[in-house]
Amino acid sequence: GNNTTEEVLRLPEMIARSKGCHIVVCIDEFQQIGDFPDSLTFQKKLRSVWQLQSHVSYCLYGSKKHMMEQMFQNANYPFYRFGDFFYLNKISEKDWVEYICQRFESTGKHISEELAREICQVTDRYSSYVHQLAWFVWLRVQDDSVATEEDLKYGIDRLLDACEPLFIQQTEDLSAYQMNFLHAIINGVHTGFTQTAILETYRLGTAANVTRLKKSLMVKDLITIPAPKHLEMSDPILALWLK
């Protein structure tokens, strides 16, 4: 019941006080709380309990940028301005390459820096995808052997297979216009969507329709704006799959 939920939420503070320490609670993919039944009521309860705690800090992270922004930067949501909002940068290619090569070596397998770099480029350095693709490549390499382009190609195919059910789910309800818009981005159009040539080539309808498409695809977290007026696909592997 209601009291039990509050007791559970108060637990970290009680433990921290009794042990005389400070606790940091980390919650990943926090935006999924938005899918709970009666989510706003639950968010209000969380906030009301958490904001009274002085021995516990909360680190809430999520991969869906638009949903996280909405929860913490929209005045209509309980967690509005609840804490500091940080955008995490991707891990650098140099660090990834070093890490991938090291992990291969430590298990008696080998991969060239060049191939490790290709893993970073295919995945656009998205941590979960780098791990997944490197793992598929690693699986295919025999002990004491060196990874090849062939292994990488195999790894990419396995990664696409693994992601396919999710990608089908993400795209099956999209309109023809929305799919056309995504294909425009995948084909290298990142700005100037309302130019006549682009509207016609990709069958995007009217300039007003483009504004609606942008908004709807951002809400679905399928596209992102990393720089002013520059649109990109949010998910590099979804882009590869749609190709």
Regions found by a protein language model. Name each.
Residues 1-64, 73:
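Conserved Walker B catalytic segment
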